[in-house]
Amino acid sequence: VLLTTESCYGGNYSWADGSGNAGDIFFLSEDAGATWKTLNPWGASPTVDANGNGWISGSSIHWAGTLEFDPFDSKKVWVGSGNGVFRTDDLTAAVPLWKFQSKGIEETVPLEVVSVPGGPLVTAIMDYDGASYKDITVSTPVHSNPIGSSNSLGYAALVGGFLRSGRVTDYGAKPAVTYDVLYHSADSGRTWKATDTASLPGSAGTLAMSADGRVFLLRPSYTHTGKNASTSTFYRSADAGKTWKPVTGLSTQDGKMISDPVNPANFYIVPSGYQGDVYASTDTGATFSKVGTLINNATGEYSASSGLLRANPYAAGDLWIALDAAQSWNASGFSSNGLAHSTDGGKTWTRIKTMVACLSVGLGKAAPGSDYPTLYMWGKANSEPLGIYRSIDKGQTWLRINDDQHQYGGPANGGFVVGDFNVYGRVYMSTAGRGIVYGNIGEIPTTSIDGRKMTAPRVRLSLHGRDLHIQDLGTKDARLELMDVSGRILQQQEVKATAVKLNENLHGLVIARLRLGSTTLASLRFVLP
């Protein structure tokens, strides 16, 4: 009989790299429960093996929810942990070794991502810190000096420096102890050093760094009482976090802040809520003043709703903001404030009229031949459906780059859609517990169709009322088939135009398939009333 504790962290888990953590305890009985022995002896090393998954090292088996014996080998056991599945091949060993079995299926909540031009991709996620990726296709160890949940990243664009904040709970202590931490990296997240938190004014929260890395800004999750108490919830440190002083000039205690990636003296803050004010600092964050508004005073047609500012890393004061950011997913519909752009540090704003609703915006590497970063956004462009869009002309035109089968529930907790500054066309989006999804511009495949070598077009289908729109077909030889779930053909026809009118007698779940010879070019599932 084998049993474990559940969220009672008295066990010690040691890894081959010398790291360790507290977790659940295993108990084994081989006499029907008359006697028991503990399988987690303190000091034994190693007791767990990352098994090629660099990010899991330093964690533990915890929240144990299920145990399963191999029905053909009682020495082999699986356990379901809060971070995945572990297995031991010899439960009877003096110190059983548990190997991590989950490859590529860990579900995480991403909060922030930064693509460093000429450098790595740096992430902040809940529960497992995040990492600095040279190659996003390779399993990578989490940030050194682990926190657990990295609440925020501050980025110094001119020097590649980072700040990372959070709260650490030491479950090995009796009772468990929780404390605030703030880590600094001077090498784009490859290594991290702890800063002095003795004077930290509150629980580590949202961060920003000046472009040269010399000034830190912090909006704590909550402020401490006593010697560090203040009515301000924005603080500034000019000595690497040793001392903090409240910033002045703000009429808000909450909001999103960023540094100017080109001018180290400038910071920007948009308060949370719907007031639409934009604040800026030109003295490295010591004082702020209102410089502009996101409300169109003539028509009152748009305002900020907790929008996250994005800055062009190659031009000072060049800012973008999504004006519908409070709604990462809303089944009943969205506001239609859209997207706004400023080139003077937030003093004046121009609404991008091609964008109907913009819930998140980000920038990435410029397209070949372009001198301006590519824009990515989650929202609705013109009369197109909700999705991920790309623009290579500062938002004048947009191309949807996902389809209805790849929405992932929208940007969710992290609220971000951002491009990669090293790979044109690569885009990242946060999700609700599904990790960071990314997309690339793929090569158009060459396919053999009916004995002919042809370039298969990258086609998309989308439903607009009872019209099925066909995008980027590039041939007149395709055939459209509409089927029910059993595969019965409901409607079929040769495609002669970019839109097909659906028969009025079609109702319920319909599967559309566009075919060229024996090759399926695109498919779409939808429900008709």
Q: Which residues does each PLM region occupy?
A:
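Signature of short aromatic-glycine-proline-rich micro-motifs recurring in repeat-based ectodomains
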Residues: 52-68, 110, 148-152, 204, ...
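Blade-level signature of beta-propeller repeat domains, shared across WD40, Kelch, NHL, RCC1
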Residues: 409-445
